[in-house]
Amino acid sequence: MDKANGAYKTALKAASAVAPAEKFPVFQATFDKNLKEGLSGPDAVGFAKKLDAFIQTSYLSTKAAEPKEKFDLFVLSLTEVLRFMAGAVKAPPASKFPAKPAPKVAAYTPAAPAGAAPKATTDEQKLIEKINVGFKAAVAAAAGVPAASKYKTFVATFGAASNKAFAEALSTEPKGAAVASSKAVLTSKLDAAYKLAYKSAEGATPEAKYDAYVATLSEALRIIAGTLEVHGVKPAAEEVKAIPAGELQVIDKVDAAFKVAATAANAAPANDKFTVFEAAFNDAIKASTGGAYQSYKFIPALEAAVKQSYAATVATAPAVKYTVFETALKKAITAMSQAQKAAKPAAAVTGTATSAVGAATGAATAAAGGYKV
């Protein structure tokens, strides 16, 4: 990481001296040259090639109308990636990077008395709570219309609320084409995730399909909220009146894993909470799904969503922070949509796997503290 950090700073300096249209080519060439100097062995060379490919992909995927804006957003993204990698391998402190050091994750808030939900304090918590308020409003709106209109009513209400939440989150950024592009990308990706969730939902009637869809979104929001220590998202079973048996079994397994992880995280020191949450969540998912673990394609995506939502909390630039967060939420929704496809095979599995975490889950319900389980 020392080598990558040095190459990064040299490339950034070289790019600052050229015209906007030349910044990325100069940056890439300089970074590549400096990174490869002195490297030896297949592992080191392989790492350099992968990092170079990542840089190219990252730049191409950055949305901005002007070359300078595009390059600036690219640098922000790369800065956060390098800082994250540096932390992972105990490389030099983040303060050695050109951008401001990432703020520490907010201190853990002890569990509130029963019936009271602690206020959101971080930007991510405020964002997910706004989305959650929109979710509840959408559920309420859909409850008052005929079955055939429930999905359409829900989407109209929830889509507007979540899009507004992201727009407000990005409103503090400097105005410009890059910001407008960021908003458009965030909302369009989430809209696509919502549609995928509904398409994947199974139900014999429009109402049953709608209930399965809402359960998917509920659990996705709950997992992300738990990662960020947000307290207001109810379990899927409390959000809808009926969930098809197959879907409920899979969602119950994810929810059981969440409860175990929440309990473990609450008992850990503040600086270790996410590490403990992640490890416990992964282990509990394996335990609750038993021998079917390897065949559940949704599990890696769900685990990735948990990691990515946490990564958003240590990003400094809003454009990076909310893009990372949006990706996490999309992954969680997609994962739970894939879980629905696993519901039918899961229904044939005995209850033995689920009972593997049953005792821990029972204790977790009472002891999960700040997480509202």
From Swiss-Prot:
Note: Its C-terminus might be membrane-associated.
Domain of life: Eukaryota
InterPro entries on file: Poa_pIX/Phl_pVI (IPR002914), Pollen_allergen/Os (IPR035506)
Keywords: Allergen, Signal
Summary of the tissues where the protein is detected: Pollen.
Protein name: Pollen allergen KBG 31
Record keyword Cytoplasm present: no
Family from the record: Belongs to the Poa p IX/Phl p VI allergen family.
Species per Swiss-Prot/TrEMBL record: Poa pratensis
